[in-house]
Amino acid sequence: MQASMLDSQWRLTIFSPRRKVKVSQMNSRFIAVLLTATILPWVAQAQDSYPSSPVTIMVPAAAGGPSDTVARLVAQSMSKTLGQQVLVENMGGAGGSLGAANVAKADPDGYRLLLYHIGVATFAALYPNLAYKPIEDFSSVGLITEVPMTIVGRKDLEPKTFADLVAIVKKNATTVTFGTAGTGAVSDLCGRLLQDALGTKITLVPYKGMGPAMTDLIGGRIDLACDQTTNTTTQIKANEVHAYAVTTKARIDVLPDVPTVDEGGLKDFELSAWHALWAPKDTPAPIREKLSEALKTALKDPMVIERFASLGTVPVAQDMATPAALDQKFKAEVERLAKVISEAGK
């Protein structure tokens, strides 16, 4: 009987609800410790060996455009530093937001990156129903370059100076056609900023990329366009279009005879198509730092510098090709451009 009581007492102790909780807590702690001991070294090893396979840079625009050109130059140089191929993939649509969504949903392992321009900073304002949030859902790697924009016109357009163009556009705004690469594209931003500076509305004509827009401009079917010098310099030098102004504070070396917008009488008008590199959110800091270092090396590569110069741009300073610098720039541009888009009424 005594043994039976002891046995009963033992069972009550072991299988009482309180004891179950204690055993469960002990098991949970043990599992947590075990997982930490096994997973953390694996994660650290994965980060140390990164990259162990090819890296893909997503350009959310058609091949052959300015962003694609920048991406392929940078990818070629980064491949040497990382010891793995850096591939470029193109996915256009919705002003770049579709390709960006592809990266936002990717695994945060550093193998799928986004390279695009200032347009990323417009997505939240232009597409309020996006399935992702640009600031929250991307991890910054670094800035790459700030490409000047050039306002160009069909070569038979009557005014030949930017000041004369401004005067004529103000008088005939509704009849002036301005080609863009679509809502949210940097060319579209240029058109919106021009409207704001002129204090009038012009007819913005959206195309599926700047290629078709430039074709129509050269063919005389639209009056004006605004695109990155990486895309317009060849046409300007071939006398296929007329260059009116660059959208930076100073003239640029590759087009020294083209005045600035400010020189033409529009004050406080400045726009550059800065390009940058992002990874999906939660990408580990060591991986982003490794990517940033490879990016910095690419921006010092003589081949990249020479090719950028021929396109009318230069790499950013080394301290700008960092996650922190891009974070600051990106947040400021999102705020600035949201106001521009709101005032333009989309």
Curated annotation (Swiss-Prot):
CDD domains: PBP2_BugD_Asp. It comes from Agrobacterium vitis (Rhizobium vitis). This is UPF0065 protein in the TAR-I ttuE-ttuC' intergenic region. It comes from the Bacteria. Keywords: Periplasm, Plasmid, Signal. InterPro entries: BUG, Bug_dom1. Belongs to the UPF0065 (bug) family. SUPFAM superfamilies: Periplasmic binding protein-like II (SSF53850). One of its GO terms (cellular component) is periplasmic space. Pfam families: TctC. Residues 1-46 form the signal peptide. The lineage of its organism: Bacteria, Pseudomonadati, Pseudomonadota, Alphaproteobacteria, Hyphomicrobiales. It is found in: Periplasm.
